[in-house]
Amino acid sequence: MASFPHPGSVTVCEINRDLITAQNLSDERAQETYGKVLGMVFSPVSFDSTPSSLQENEGQENGDKASGESKGLVATLQMKVADSLKQILQPTDVTLLSEIDLQGVSWHQGKHIIAFISGANQVTIRDYEDKDEKEPCILTSDSQRNVKALEWRPNGGKSLSIACRGGICIWAASYPGNMALVRSGGSALRGSLSRGSGTRWILVDFLRCQNDEQISALSWSPCGRYLASASYDSSSFTIWDVSQGAGTPIRRGLGGISMLKWSPTGDYFFAARFDGTFCLWETNTWTSEPWSLSSGSGSVTGAIWDPEGRFILISFSKSSTLGSVHFSSKPPSLDAHLLPVELPEIASLTGCEGIEKIAWDASGERLAVSYKGGDENYKGLIAIYDTRRTPIVSASLVGFIRGPGENPKALSFSFHDKFKQGPLLSVCWSTGFCCTYPLIFRSHVLP
């Protein structure tokens, strides 16, 4: 029977398909349940969850108005024509943005370091390996406006990319023996600051896009050399050679891009649009194959590759069933077929109206799912599934995770890909806490 956290309780961890709860957030309770097994406790990190998007948008609109006045009549008319065309081509992109699983939290691939969006213009970093760090580090910069997504750079030391308005901020850790270097010829970096008691972070580069676009999607190539970015303002995505600071735009079709996902092997690339379509690319010659599903499925809200890059799981805004696109041949072939992946009990138990976000751990054994709607008992919970990948993907419900505070809702969540003792899920809750949940079920981990 699936574990259900009663209202008023908070989830602590999983122990062998049993999701343990407590009355409140407590390091003592965490130490009792999983701390002795793992040798560490992942304390929750608090942040200001007060909505600030309205202030950000107002500031942007005022800035646009002042900019238009200063540029004169001709420039203002040109800007209005461009805005009108954008409204015609992409009429609902911004309103649909809230339905897309923007990557708001990310674990470093090789360290116990987590980064998450903690404000309209700021990012918080918590290093669980630094015993001397008394408080998390806050990253802010004049260049870092309206943060939408972030992702650690693979094979890049402690380097973090952040999607902002106008471009991408690249931060790097700087400490004795490993000084962070600013890229030669990079954009002027003004007002960059990291606040905290631990490692010092330096804004080493700002990859500037055209027309002050809002970057809303990021994905690193597995080797860490290339960074893909996209905006809901544009129908193209850009592949950046980060060391050179050079970007190459790639376009196919119309409409804003909502999501980018590079496969773990680097052979394939996934790009979804707000109109419900998506493309699968092979990265040898950058050839693509477009996909279009029935309108009854809605738009793509989440996508995750399996650990070997053989297929990709996709969630949809109007369906409680996932899709699994399997490749029929080896790369660079784009021959593939779509299979449904049922999520047992989620619709019958919760009454959900569609999937909001999904995350899959690197072992392929635990799948986290948040959903739209739900009755008073199930609203705002995260469903945890035990998954198998052979011969096809199947899932069985383990239970549900409940966050802290009143009426918590998951803003974003992600797994730590390289935590040896098992899946490690971190969730940023609307109540102002980033909580980490060890999912322990392997016999060699438990005493």
UniProtKB/Swiss-Prot annotation:
One GO location term (cellular component): nuclear pore
Localisation per UniProt entry: Nucleus envelope; Nucleus, Nuclear pore complex
Region (Disordered): 49-69
Main subcellular location of this protein, as a coarse class: nucleus
One Gene Ontology biological process: mRNA transport
Alphabetized Gene3D superfamilies for the sequence: YVTN repeat-like/Quinoprotein amine dehydrogenase
Keyword terms of this UniProt record: mRNA transport, Nuclear pore complex, Nucleus, Protein transport, Repeat, Translocation, Transport, WD repeat
WD repeat positions: 97-138, 142-181, 210-250, 252-291
Record Pfam families: Beta-prop_Aladin (PF25460)
Segment forming the signal sequence: none
Subunit details: Part of the nuclear pore complex (NPC). The NPC has an eight-fold symmetrical structure comprising a central transport channel and two rings, the cytoplasmic and nuclear rings, to which eight filaments are attached. The cytoplasmic filaments have loose ends, while the nuclear filaments are joined in a distal ring, forming a nuclear basket. NPCs are highly dynamic in configuration and composition, and can be devided in 3 subcomplexes, the NUP62 subcomplex, the NUP107-160 subcomplex and the NUP93 subcomplex, containing approximately 30 different nucleoporin proteins.
Name used for this protein in its record: Aladin
Species of origin: Arabidopsis thaliana (Mouse-ear cress)
